Amino acid sequence: MADITKDQVVEFISNMTVLELSEFITELEEKFGVSAAAPVAAVAAMPGAAGGEAAGGEEQTEFDVILKSAGGNKIAVIKAVRALTGLGLKEAKAKVDEAPAAIKEGVEKAEAEEALKQLEEAGAEAEMK
């Protein structure tokens, strides 16, 4: 194996565009037969499955904003996605085209609510998880 450090791998990945990173993740999922999204969905489903069993359950502190569809005004939604994520035009358009797609991940409730509001004002259908 080559003398590549973890820091070099992290640096390489941090320089990827969102589209390149998405393709990279897909390749890793296919190579290792796993899904990066499955554990998140399983963890999110667990508290609901427990019902009233967990009286001292933890309150969710990190939220994801998911774009479900662009709605009727795709251009406004692309502009909103660019403003929220800092992506370039091409990457933001790709993100909108591949909906449902995560726009914000692991953010605080207030930030997630604001992002959701901006997307909905632009005409998008979005949800907060």
From Swiss-Prot:
This is Large ribosomal subunit protein bL12. SUPFAM superfamilies: ClpS-like, Ribosomal protein L7/12, oligomerisation (N-terminal) domain. PANTHER family: 39S RIBOSOMAL PROTEIN L12, LARGE RIBOSOMAL SUBUNIT PROTEIN BL12M. CDD domains: Ribosomal_L7_L12 (cd00387). GO terms for cellular component: cytosolic large ribosomal subunit. It comes from Maridesulfovibrio salexigens (strain ATCC 14822 / DSM 2638 / NCIMB 8403 / VKM B-1763). GO terms for biological process: translation. The keyword tRNA-binding does not apply. Homodimer. Part of the ribosomal stalk of the 50S ribosomal subunit. Forms a multimeric L10(L12)X complex, where L10 forms an elongated spine to which 2 to 4 L12 dimers bind in a sequential fashion. Binds GTP-bound translation factors. Keywords: Ribonucleoprotein, Ribosomal protein. One of its GO terms (molecular function) is structural constituent of ribosome. It comes from the Bacteria. Belongs to the bacterial ribosomal protein bL12 family. Pfam families: Ribosomal_L12, Ribosomal_L12_N. HAMAP family: Ribosomal_bL12. Forms part of the ribosomal stalk which helps the ribosome interact with GTP-bound translation factors. Is thus essential for accurate translation.
